[in-house]
Amino acid sequence: MERYESLFAQLKERKEGAFVPFVTLGDPGIEQSLKIIDTLIEAGADALELGIPFSDPLADGPTIQNATLRAFAAGVTPAQCFEMLALIRQKHPTIPIGLLMYANLVFNKGIDEFYAQCEKVGVDSVLVADVPIEESAPFRQAALRHNVAPIFICPPNADDDLLRQIASYGRGYTYLLSRAGVTGAENRAALPLNHLVAKLKEYNAAPPLQGFGISAPDQVKAAIDAGAAGAISGSAIVKIIEQHINEPEKMLAALKVFVQPMKAATRS
């Protein structure tokens, strides 16, 4: 959890925002997935947002669903994902690692046991995509017991009450939704969310990172200009993996070419 605090403090000092890529663990296979993550970090990723393959991903558009299917085809299990997380943490001791999850995967383990395992391998945050804030108590309490930041989604239409709850319960960062709907780079992020950012600041929420539909450097810059602490890009990155599925080296090179200007756009 503290890794987010020190990251945001360092970025503030350097007058930079955070660029955070999302990928599915084990896509397209364990070995290449670990290389992908190393490449993202080398190219300038400030933190990682990682998915564990799940058979019914509700919030995901077709691109990320395909990533999940590729990981399943490679036989990747949640247990192997945790082994991967331990390896990533060993190699990269300071980078914040967040998981984007669905409740079933947390329940399968038992809520407390799941967060205990996160703590053990060095996961900093968990966002459970299909648990609304009013049902989040058992998740966020277990998270805090194990020094894992509970992350909450702030939708574009959030009312004052929801903004206060997000500020009060969330830690690490706040996932600021560019728009309602499922993830995907096709639907470019809508207008900057200045009013939400201002309200979240007023209520002392964890720094907002804007996600959903972020696929170009100008969108990263727009998010930061609107007051967000950074941007999360998932589908655009997963698409690169898909496009170069049979050319592992080309894939890594293309990921680097995508991430470098995205990170550069965070520098004011």
UniProtKB/Swiss-Prot annotation:
Active site: 49, 60
InterPro entries tied to this protein: Aldolase_TIM, RibuloseP-bd_barrel, Trp_synthase_alpha_AS, Trp_synthase_suA
Enzyme class name: lyase
Catalytic activity: (1S,2R)-1-C-(indol-3-yl)glycerol 3-phosphate + L-serine = D-glyceraldehyde 3-phosphate + L-tryptophan + H2O
Gene Ontology cellular-component annotations: cytosol
Protein origin, superkingdom: Bacteria
PANTHER family: TRYPTOPHAN SYNTHASE ALPHA CHAIN, CHLOROPLASTIC, TRYPTOPHAN SYNTHASE, ALPHA CHAIN
Subunit composition and interactions: Tetramer of two alpha and two beta chains.
The protein's name in its UniProt record: Tryptophan synthase alpha chain
